[in-house]
C-alpha cells in the first residue's frame, strides 16, 4: 500500500486542480448504512418528471437514480435540479434512502469538454451502445475541474438531506459509474497514443476520492467495480497491468474514505459458470463486514432472463442473482444492499422473488 501511495503522489502535479485536505473520515459516519433491496431508476430525458410508482413497493428500501450529467447541467452554472428534488422529496415521504449515480465521461455536457483533451470511442455497453462519442481523458484537469465544480453545487444543495445516503464516485469513467474504459485492441492503441499510464489513472481517482470525501461528509461514497487498462508505465501493452491498477484504486478509496467507503459490483447475474458469471462478485463478497458492500444487477431479468442466468424464466433468474449477491463470506457476513432494475420491481410475477430477497436483509 505504501508503494502505491508513493507512486500516486509522484504524478499528482498532473492534476493541478487546487489542494484539498486528505480526509480519512473514519471518526464520524452517516446515521445509517445503505441497506436492503434497492430499485434502479433510469432517467428518461424526454420526460419532465420521474415515474416514482415503484417507491410504493413494500420490499424496496432504497432508490438508485441513474442520470447523465449533461441532462442536469446542459448549460454551465444553470443546473436543473427538478428531478433530483422530486426524488428526494418522494423518498423522504416514503421512508426510502437514495443513491445518486450521475454519469459524466461520455455523457458530460459539451461545454465541459471545451479545452479538454478527448478521444472518440464507441459506447461500449448500455443505452446508445456502439454510438461514437467523445470521451474526455480521465486525468484531464479541465474536464475534472468542471466536474468538481458540479459536485460542489450538488453537495451544497443535497449534502444535508437525510434521504441522500450514497453518492457514487465518478469522473475518470466512461459510460456509467463503473471505473471501466474502452479496452478493445484498437482502443488500447488510442490510449497508448494519448499517454495513458496506470499512475495517471490512479492519481485521477485519488483526487476524485478526496473531493467526494470533502464535499459529502454526511454520505457514503460508492465505487462501482471496474479495472484499469492493460497498459503499463512505459505505455506498453501488458495483460497484467489492469489488475494491480484496480487494486490500487480500491486501496486509495479505502484509505481516503475510511468506513464511509462502499464497494459495489454492478455486473451481478445468476450464471453459475465462472467463465460467464461476474468476476467481481467474489472480490466484493470478500469485503463484506469490513466495509459497506453492494451489488447491482447487470440488466433486467424480465427483459433478458437468458443473460441473467435462466433463459425464459425471469423469476428464477432473479432468485439466482439474489442468491449470488447475498451469499455470506467465510466470516458469515452478507452484502449490505442489492440493486434491481425498475422493470423487475414493477412486474407482478416478480413480487415473490422480491419478498424473498427482502427477507435476506432483515
Regions picked out by a protein language model, each given a short descriptive name:
Residues 6-8, 301:
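Sequence-pattern detector for short linear motifs
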Residues 31-196, 212, 217-241, 246, ...:
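Aromatic-lined carbohydrate-binding surfaces of glycoside hydrolases
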Residues 9-21:
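Bacterial N-terminal signal peptides
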Amino acid at each position: 500500500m505504501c508503494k502505491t501511495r508513493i507512486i500516486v503522489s509522484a504524478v499528482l502535479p498532473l492534476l493541478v486542480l487546487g489542494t484539498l485536505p486528505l480526509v480519512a473520515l473514519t471518526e464520524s459516519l452517516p446515521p445509517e448504512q445503505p441497506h436492503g433491496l434497492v430499485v434502479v431508476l433510469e432517467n428518461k430525458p424526454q420526460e419532465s418528471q420521474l415515474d416514482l410508482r415503484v417507491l410504493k413497493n413494500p420490499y424496496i428500501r432504497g432508490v438508485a437514480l441513474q442520470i447523465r450529467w449533461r441532462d442536469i447541467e446542459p448549460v454551465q452554472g444553470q443546473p436543473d435540479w427538478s428531478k433530483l428534488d422530486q426524488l428526494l422529496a418522494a423518498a423522504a415521504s416514503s421512508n426510502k434512502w437514495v443513491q445518486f449515480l450521475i454519469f459524466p465521461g461520455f455523457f458530460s455536457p459539451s461545454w465541459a469538454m471545451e479545452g479538454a483533451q478527448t478521444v472518440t470511442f464507441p459506447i461500449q455497453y448500455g443505452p446508445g451502445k456502439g454510438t461514437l462519442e467523445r470521451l474526455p481523458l480521465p486525468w484531464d484537469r479541465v474536464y475534472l475541474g468542471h466536474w468538481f465544480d458540479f459536485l460542489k453545487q450538488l453537495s451544497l444543495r443535497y449534502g444535508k438531506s437525510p434521504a441522500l445516503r450514497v453518492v457514487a464516485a465518478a469522473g475518470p469513467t466512461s459510460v456509467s459509474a463503473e471505473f471501466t474504459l474502452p479496452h478493445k485492441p484498437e482502443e488500447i492503441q488510442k490510449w497508448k497514443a494519448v499517454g495513458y499510464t496506470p499512475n495517471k489513472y490512479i492519481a485521477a481517482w485519488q483526487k476524485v476520492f478526496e473531493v467526494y470525501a470533502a464535499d459529502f461528509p454526511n454520505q457514503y461514497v460508492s465505487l462501482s467495480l471496474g479495472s484499469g487498462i492493460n497498459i503499463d508505465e512505459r505505455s506498453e501493452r501488458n495483460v497484467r497491468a489492469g489488475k494491480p491498477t484496480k487494486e490500487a484504486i480500491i486501496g486509495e478509496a479505502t484509505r481516503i474514505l475510511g468506513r464511509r467507503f462502499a464497494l459495489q459490483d454492478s455486473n451481478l447475474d445468476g450464471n453459475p459458470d465462472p467463465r460467464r458469471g461476474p468476476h467481481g462478485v467474489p472480490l466484493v463478497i470478500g469485503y463484506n463486514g469490513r466495509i459497506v458492500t453492494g451489488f447491482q444487477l447487470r440488466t433486467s431479468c424480465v427483459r433478458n432472463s437468458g443473460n441473467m442466468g435462466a433463459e425464459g424464466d425471469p423469476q428464477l433468474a432473479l432468485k439466482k442473482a439474489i442468491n449470488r449477491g447475498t451469499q455470506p463470506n467465510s466470516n458469515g457476513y452478507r452484502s449490505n444492499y442489492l440493486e434491481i432494475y425498475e422493470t423487475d420491481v414493477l412486474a407482478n410475477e416478480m413480487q415473490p422473488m422480491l419478498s424473498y430477497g427482502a427477507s435476506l436483509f432483515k
